[in-house]
Amino acid sequence: MTVQVAVALTKKTQQEQPMINERIHFPRVRVVDTDGSQLGIMSSQEAIAIAREKELDLVLVSDKADPPVCKIIDYGKFRFEQEKKAREARKKQHTSDVKEVKMRYKIEEHDYNVCINRAERFLKAGDKVKATVTFRGREIQHSHLAEELLNRMANDLQAVAEVQQAPKQEGRNMIMFLAPKR
């Protein structure tokens, strides 16, 4: 069982690595030089010889074309550039989290302002905000006051946020989702 796992892992890593130099098993390939000019169609052995003369590598760019396209480049530099592009793409991706702001419908003005400021900070950071009003005991009878509070919050944050989900009751909570404005 262990041998099969090792074989499967090596097959996967071979598929991820691009075909370079002797790994290219096509009899004839179209060769592109380092400056982008085409050298024409030739055998893969001739192309490898030309790449070796220039102290570079022959890298398979597209095996779907007929004949397959290979490029003469410095493989180490090529791989570094690809990894650099991947790192830059990962840096630019921002996963927006959902941050929660909890309060009660009988909230004091200062506490309400603190909640508004916190929600505004989350929204400016690009995160979504889940505003939750919790009820205890018989407070659930005053759900209209909680809805008014959440609508007031949406109104106060309309400069930086848009309502993604209007206030709705879920069990002993009333929730509303806000998303940052684009």
UniProtKB/Swiss-Prot annotation:
Gene Ontology CC annotations of this record: cytosol; membrane
InterPro entries attached to this UniProt entry: T_IF-3_C_sf (IPR036788), T_IF-3_N_sf (IPR036787), Translation_initiation_fac3_CS (IPR019813), Translation_initiation_fac_3 (IPR001288), Translation_initiation_fac_3_C (IPR019815), Translation_initiation_fac_3_N (IPR019814)
Gene Ontology MF terms in the entry: ribosome binding; translation initiation factor activity
Keyword Membrane: no
Localization per Swiss-Prot or TrEMBL: Cytoplasm
Pfam families (UniProt xref): IF3_C, IF3_N
The keyword Cytoplasm is assigned to this record: yes
Keywords noted in UniProt: Cytoplasm, Initiation factor, Protein biosynthesis
GO biological-process terms attached to the record: ribosome disassembly
Subunit structure: Monomer.
HAMAP family: IF_3
Family assignment from sequence similarity: Belongs to the IF-3 family.
Function: IF-3 binds to the 30S ribosomal subunit and shifts the equilibrium between 70S ribosomes and their 50S and 30S subunits in favor of the free subunits, thus enhancing the availability of 30S subunits on which protein synthesis initiation begins.
NCBIfam families, sorted: infC
Protein name (record): Translation initiation factor IF-3
The gene coding this protein: infC
